[in-house]
């Protein structure tokens, strides 16, 4: 088997995790207590969904997941929620005091007390796998636990499981909406280790997803539940090929191979289509070409940056439902002819497509319409650099005055770590600039004539 272990860290990671496991259970027909009436091979078997669920002898399906937080409230919601019987109690790890939005507390003082326990649980899950494929790590980089403990865990996973791939789903701070004053510090410090220790990181941004919910689903005041259900559709589409049998299946390692041209350039944009409410879906024809086009719309991107300001290096389209390769090829050919969607000149093909025949499921009582087909796009675009330069700018404004730095130093960090992380991100911005401008030097003169 090619098992995947999911690790959910901090409030954002856990709440996105709840939405994901709720959706996985629906897709596979697994009940809230872990029983699966449709499963023919009780207590094992080689079903495709066993990549994400392990089975006990009594026919109970247990997610291969760990939830970690430094304070108990969010995890207690899982312990008392609808799916409380789904998870093994040992998989829900919570501490007593939180990281107080402080990277240093999550990474050094409080995080290091809990990290060995987490690794111990992860080791148990890994020993339970026959062919562990890699880890999916869910966290946010603005808070203290997601950023601090998140990067600590990633560093330790690199040591213990060097060759296994690590896919990150990371919530980055939004341009306008801020949840804490020290977000820029936490994000920069945390990205410094994401650069080193994840193989692919998908950037998510609450504001971008808010706007999608408002615009496409007509929800006036979206809640985190609305956002997370949308994010879970993206993550479900990415992992569908691991959990179901399809025509063109895509492995976790394949994302890496197809999307990452240079090891550091591994921050992805994601988008999903169709995001549409039930009232509207009834009246619209959502063909493969249409959903493919809308996945490329700048407004569909789940992070606040405009792909028209950059160039695409590679892009992965995961279709599910009633889709045939012929339609996909036609849709991709159309996209290639569009002037607004520019690829770097050293990557002429740039598309990886996957198809899965399992149609997308929706949570009953949720906002999304049940549709016949959907597409999820993960793309590597140079425009992602906008996310980093925004955070770097805010970091510089605060760090110039050394504002709030004493809270970090007091928890055992050194000022040198701030400047080291900031320099690493400056280098990353430079890397993105160079990647987008590779072979353009000689041709600057001719470009004006084309339009």
UniProtKB/Swiss-Prot annotation:
GTP binds at residues 11, 71, 144-145, 179, 206, 228. It is an enzyme of class 3 (hydrolase). Pfam families: Tubulin (PF00091), Tubulin_C (PF03953). The record marks 451 as: Involved in polymerization. Its EC number is 3.6.5.-. GO terms for molecular function: GTP binding; hydrolase activity; metal ion binding; structural constituent of cytoskeleton. Its cofactor is Mg(2+). It catalyses: GTP + H2O = GDP + phosphate + H(+). Keywords: Acetylation, Cytoplasm, Cytoskeleton, GTP-binding, Hydrolase, Magnesium, Metal-binding, Microtubule, Nucleotide-binding. InterPro entries: Alpha_tubulin, Tub_FtsZ_C, Tubulin, Tubulin/FtsZ-like_C, Tubulin/FtsZ_2-layer-sand-dom, Tubulin/FtsZ_GTPase_sf, Tubulin_C, Tubulin_CS. The modification N6-acetyllysine is found at residue 40. One of its GO terms (cellular component) is cytoplasm. The active site is at residue 254. It is found in: Cytoplasm, Cytoskeleton. Mg(2+) binds at residue 71. Belongs to the tubulin family. Dinitroaniline herbicides (such as trifluralin and oryzalin) are antimicrotubule drugs that bind to tubulins and inhibit polymerization. Prolonged use of these chemicals has resulted in the selection of resistant (R) and intermediately resistant (I) biotypes. Dimer of alpha and beta chains. A typical microtubule is a hollow water-filled tube with an outer diameter of 25 nm and an inner diameter of 15 nM. Alpha-beta heterodimers associate head-to-tail to form protofilaments running lengthwise along the microtubule wall with the beta-tubulin subunit facing the microtubule plus end conferring a structural polarity. Microtubules usually have 13 protofilaments but different protofilament numbers can be found in some organisms and specialized cells. This is Tubulin alpha-1 chain. It comes from Eleusine indica.
């Amino acid at each position: 088997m090619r098992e995947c272990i999911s690790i959910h860290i901090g409030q954002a990671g856990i709440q996105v995790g709840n939405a994901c496991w709720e959706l996985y259970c629906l897709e596979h027909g697994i009940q809230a207590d872990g029983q699966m009436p449709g499963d023919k091979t009780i207590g094992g078997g080689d079903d495709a969904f066993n990549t994400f669920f392990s089975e006990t002898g009594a026919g109970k399906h247990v997610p291969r997941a760990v939830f970690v937080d430094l304070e108990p409230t969010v995890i207690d919601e899982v312990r008392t929620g609808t799916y409380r019987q789904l998870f093994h109690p040992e998989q829900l790890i919570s501490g007593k005091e939180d990281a107080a939005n402080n990277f240093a507390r999550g990474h050094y003082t409080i995080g290091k007390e809990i990290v060995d326990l987490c690794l111990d649980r992860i080791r148990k899950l890994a020993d339970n796998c026959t062919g562990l494929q890699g880890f999916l790590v869910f966290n946010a980089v603005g808070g203290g636990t997601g950023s601090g403990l998140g990067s600590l865990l990633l560093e330790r996973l690199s040591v213990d499981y060097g060759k296994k791939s690590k896919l990150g789903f990371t919530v980055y701070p939004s341009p306008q909406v801020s949840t804490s004053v020290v977000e820029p510090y936490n994000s920069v410090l945390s990205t410094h280790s994401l650069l080193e220790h994840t193989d692919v990181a998908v950037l998510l941004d609450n504001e971008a997803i808010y706007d999608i919910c408002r615009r496409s689903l007509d929800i006036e005041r979206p809640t985190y539940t609305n956002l997370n259900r949308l994010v879970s559709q993206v993550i479900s589409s990415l992992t569908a090929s691991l959990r179901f049998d399809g025509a063109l299946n895509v492995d976790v390692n394949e994302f890496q191979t197809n999307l990452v041209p240079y090891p550091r350039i591994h921050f992805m944009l994601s988008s999903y289509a169709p995001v549409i409410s039930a009232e509207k879906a009834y009246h619209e024809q959502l063909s493969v070409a249409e959903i493919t086009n809308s996945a490329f719309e700048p407004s569909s991107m789940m992070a606040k940056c405009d792909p028209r300001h950059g160039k695409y290096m590679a892009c992965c389209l995961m279709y599910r439902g009633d889709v045939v390769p012929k339609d996909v090829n036609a849709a991709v050919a159309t996209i290639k002819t569009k002037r607004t969607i520019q690829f770097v000149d050293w990557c002429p093909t740039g598309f990886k497509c996957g198809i899965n025949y399992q149609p997308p499921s929706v949570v009953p009582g949720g906002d999304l319409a049940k549709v016949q087909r959907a597409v999820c796009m993960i793309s590597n675009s140079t425009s992602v650099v906008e996310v980093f330069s925004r955070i770097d700018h805010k970091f510089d404004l605060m760090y110039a005055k050394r504002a709030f730095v004493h809270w970090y130093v007091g928890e055992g960090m050194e000022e040198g770590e701030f400047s080291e992380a900031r320099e690493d991100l400056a280098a990353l911005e430079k890397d993105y600039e160079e990647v987008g401008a590779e072979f353009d030097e000689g041709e600057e003169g001719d470009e004006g004539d084309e339009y």
